[in-house]
């Protein structure tokens, strides 16, 4: 990167006066409606609403919906969009989230009328194309993961975890093994793992990690007994390190009657190269909105399909999609199923996008993992002289750095993350995993170029150099974003989630 790096803001140069300070809420906009189309006489007789709905309680006054002209609303939304970072603006190295660029063609395919304008309760004969896509996607995902069958119903990764654990419970119950109520989970696991286990009514037992970041096999063996239903693992783990002892863990788990659960959050490092089923995993959940390039979106639209080995197929959520000759059908006759876990059949639009993504790569899908690992290792090599690394093990698709022990005493991960925003660069995940103090987790994904990786590394170097000169300036960052630091404690204790009119 040539020349000095200076903080910059996203958006247009020379902002208009309305950019100054906070963007008003849509309720605060309004005013002259301008020129509007004239109302057309349609010859429809009108009647009072009370006469049309006798006996129904009606509002005394209309709701306080904003009356905003369309041009004003369009500009308001445009300004908000420019204030938010996104992949159209630059790299998004949010560790453990796989924020890759999603191909626009997948969006176009998901909007085809034959997919977008159908209803899930139409007769199966009317939606053969949609059922065929689901049937074929299941088999593609089975080939990628090494599973026997997959349910496409779960709507997110954590939902998939809960679904997988419910199938594990059903499996043990069907064998009369009803006293298995514990789940072993590594200390570096995603927080959704213990949350999902608790929601399923299981007791969580934490397994410690080795200094190299991998699961301590001896600690697993110490906790394995007849009360353990499953072990949940992520591979590579949340430190970006491949679990080299996974085959041994699978062996001792199965010998003790427990099952091995695969959190597919990090499958982007392995897709096309290695399969969880070949490692001994019995249940797998995937994040289509990570590995298979469907959109991320605040709690949805996500998709967290769950795959199982042959021994657990009877417990899959119903219905499943089956093929009878050239016809596709929905099978509701599954007496051992855990039942439905989602309205309809899952987030179908996400399935269309993932299917298109996988078919576009075809047999070359291993390039996803190869380039994801290459990018992460290159970025890590650039940052080694800037931040200490959490572990010395070679990373896969992501890695964890730390500001603890850096050449600037008192440098915090939060300050680095906030200052990055001033440079128009999105921050890595901070303070996760919790086993690493002052953690910064970077995941560049396979869709980034060397130029964008160099930009991120150079900005990090500039921030550390700045901290050596004036650490207090970082402590108050960001300085050039529309919103600076917020009171996170107040926001957590007293969240304001809706607009209320001034009394």
Feature map (PLM): residue ranges:
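Long, C-terminal catalytic modules of enzymes
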Residues: 301-305, 309-344, 348, 353-363
